Amino acid sequence: MVDLSVSPDSLKPVSLTSSLVFLMHLLLLQPGEPSSEVKVLGPEYPILALVGEEVEFPCHLWPQLDAQQMEIRWFRSQTFNVVHLYQEQQELPGRQMPAFRNRTKLVKDDIAYGSVVLQLHSIIPSDKGTYGCRFHSDNFSGEALWELEVAGLGSDPHLSLEGFKEGGIQLRLRSSGWYPKPKVQWRDHQGQCLPPEFEAIVWDAQDLFSLETSVVVRAGALSNVSVSIQNLLLSQKKELVVQIADVFVPGASAWKSAFVATLPLLLVLAALALGVLRKQRRSREKLRKQAEKRQEKLTAELEKLQTELDWRRAEGQAEWRAAQKYAVDVTLDPASAHPSLEVSEDGKSVSSRGAPPGPAPGHPQRFSEQTCALSLERFSAGRHYWEVHVGRRSRWFLGACLAAVPRAGPARLSPAAGYWVLGLWNGCEYFVLAPHRVALTLRVPPRRLGVFLDYEAGELSFFNVSDGSHIFTFHDTFSGALCAYFRPRAHDGGEHPDPLTICPLPVRGTGVPEENDSDTWLQPYEPADPALDWW
């Protein structure tokens, strides 16, 4: 196997499409916002592609912006040299340069987020050069440029013994399919360079390099003789080593007699070696077919899983939209807030202010150790939905708890203690305690969180408002009135200590139980971890 890795300082290959999905939140530009704030981002480093293989050109807008109505043009060197054109929500192959027709494919699964990928197939040496992508609309135009480098590692070298010449043995090497022009080097057993007797490196019909070189090995250089072909762009080479004994050097007639005597044995050994090679080739072919069958099976399973994932994602978005019908107006209770927290005058946001300036007024509803606050509202029946803007905080807990939970001392945020909460730790670790820690993987980091309580069904669900996806649902039996729970964490380790803010929503319902509701919620599953310490 040949290692095709390249230093990031020079070239950096582009990964597959699945690794290029940008895990970021949805930021929409406001009407009239200056187009200069939008950037077109392409590959950061030059792209290295192998001859005959496929390469991907990713481009996206930052901040994210719906590009479905835009013109997106991939070009080479100049914008009029069209590689691929997307215009008026359709692709226009007739506008392509002849060299790129039937060789491109546009992947626009995330075009609504301003992210697209162009695949270029069957790479040839002439594809090398400068490329760019350009986004254009009535109020915005921008482009990004990058370089494409092309390399071919070439075929396995073929070495042959041509015979005796000028008192030595003549060796000849042939290979093809190299790009750019390779470097050939002969060396003796001591690593010293051997000058070639003949060397020719020429272009072939596919614009690749073919080479032929020979060397005459004399008695002083016999033993191990090696020849290497190096691709300087890839920093890779192919090398052959041949062993030649001194007895094969032309000389006395005794050598000729010995050679004639050993020739039948050499022929037998060659026949045996040929048989072994054929057997190995058949074995490799069998293994290749088995690998292809396994690959087909895995591909089918992957497609099935992707279909199921798409269905679940669509179902979660439908459940979120249904939950919004039960929006309620939630207000923070300042009397419950820990002394280190600051509740806004309108009761809609809470933030950490560090150590309290002095002793807080005593109140039986105030939390003494938990840096949290509850809502004024108490929910003991019906369905209720509210949303909280979490911004870029790296640590928080949100959800609901029993109104009667103890206000003094620490508490474990689990259903057994009367807490049903979702937590974020260190900016990327989302989890719940149910009752053990269950880690959650989110496709898009939420900047706004939706919480839906169905009291009679015993369900508390969380939604990522940034992409409308369902995150997690607690299933339990509630034994008393519940309050909305807010904990911004007093010692946030992030760079953006935004407050937790209750978002205004149009109140469409009163939270009255609804009959014949068969909504279902999806739950990610992970093995339970050992119990955690107090939070």
Swiss-Prot record:
Residues annotated as domain Ig-like V-type: 54-135
Segments in the Cytoplasmic topological domain: 278-535
Membrane-related topology note: Single-pass type I membrane protein
S-S bonds: 59-133
Location in or out of the cell: Membrane
Residue ranges of domain B30.2/SPRY in the record: 310-509
Record protein name field: Butyrophilin-like protein 9
UniProt lineage: Eukaryota, Metazoa, Chordata, Craniata, Vertebrata
Gene name tied to this protein: BTNL9
